[in-house]
Regions:
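Short hydrophobic alpha-helices and adjacent helix-cap/hinge residues
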Residues: 1-227
Length: 227
């Protein structure tokens, strides 16, 4: 995105899955972008509180949660802050884990898993977290750590459960902005839109491999179940 804006300050740009367009310098504000770019943000940090609720539902004895995130980006720090806010109400202790290297991730997850009654929340998706997707999923499964991820890609790759913005819905809504711009409206005047539809996906194959029993009530609420 930044490279596109540097290439042209006049060609209209509609982005779809940007986490923090204001913090990233893409727009001046959510209400009035002010430049040649507008679009749809995935920055809905309250969803991470919901993620903790879902994780507690699938693992009611869980008392410790490892939060895997990149603290250097808004998506990582903001997501962790949202989880911190609700953690006391669920009676869980949080352990932040960085994503600087694969070795750091592996050492941290292995050490965390030793104490038992743990779970994992992955805060993202950010460019620094995504490259470690398969490693994180494999470690969580191997050490029987119930884990929740941020979008369907993770659950399709073997993650236990995912909850986050429906990216396909974001793309459909973006088409409306493209149409409005083609009809003469300016990106600078089109406010940044937040997610309105969220998707819950449960991977039953992974649940069985981990020995996790998914409550029927949770299965009934899932948008997709992978078997």
């Amino acid at each position: 995105m930044a490279a596109l804006q540097q290439a042209s300050r006049t060609v209209p740009i509609v982005f779809v899955t940007t986490i923090d367009p204001v913090g990233g310098g893409l727009v001046e504000s959510l209400a009035r972008p002010g430049g040649n770019a507008t679009g749809f943000s995935t920055r809905e940090f309250s969803m991470f509180g919901k993620s903790l609720e879902l994780l507690k539902e699938i693992a009611p004895r869980m008392s410790r949660v490892a939060v895997i995130r990149d603290p250097a980006v808004a998506g990582g720090s903001g997501g962790f802050a949202a989880i911190q806010t609700v953690a006391p109400s669920f009676g869980v202790e949080l352990t932040p884990i960085g994503v600087r290297t694969a070795d750091e991730i592996e050492r941290s997850i292995v050490a965390f898993a030793r104490s038992g009654n743990g779970g994992v929340i992955v805060v993202g998706p950010t460019s620094s977290v995504q490259p470690h997707r398969n490693l994180i999923i494999a470690l969580a499964t191997q050490h029987r750590l119930p884990a929740i991820y941020t979008n369907t890609i993770w659950s399709k790759a073997g993650g236990l459960i995912s909850y986050g913005p429906d990216n396909l819905d974001q793309y459909r809504r973006a088409a409306g902005y493209v149409d409005r711009i083609l009809r003469g409206e300016k990106p600078a005047d089109l406010p940044i839109q937040q997610p309105t539809k969220f998707e819950l996906v449960i991977n039953l194959k992974t649940a069985k491999a981990m020995g996790v029993t998914v409550p029927e009530a949770l299965l009934a609420r899932a948008d997709k179940v992978i078997e």
